[in-house]
């Protein structure tokens, strides 16, 4: 603690970090929240368009990877905001509330999106591992071919034109009456969302 400079510096091994004053952090946090909100709006619009394409059976890997690309950039902003919230302490409650409102449902949607399009016949996917892989990239913008590879597809540009069919997790999760086990049963018994939508009542 430097009383002369009115600063607090944290040390751990070779790591050194000087805490900022609250009056400096709040404007930065508010600006980051606005950026996060813009990302959220763009992704939500893309998900609406994706839903329309899913019902028309027109989805290609390009649409899916583009959404994931945007979400990865959004995650980086989210990580910065989480640091601001920690530094602000009780002063960061409003920022925390705004953060939760923006990211809460959207993260669930993207979780389901990954489950829908992960290229594994067994339907086994560890969401945390996928998110971990996405965080490994430090580039300003991850190439969508890289996104395709993370989802289990070949890392080639022409792969992006490949038509893909969702398993149904994302849209089925919106039906409040369906428990998680019911969704798993439907996904296991049918070959994709189109088959579920086209199924007769006695088949469901």
Located regions from the model:
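Extended, alpha-helix-rich binding/interface surfaces that flank or overlap catalytic cores
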Residues: 2-6, 10-17, 130, 139
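Secondary-structure junction/capping motif
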Residues: 9-10, 14-21, 57-60, 143, ...
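Charged, amphipathic alpha-helical linkers/stalks
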Residues: 17-90
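Extracellular LysM carbohydrate-binding repeats and other cell-envelope/extracellular binding modules
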Residues: 204
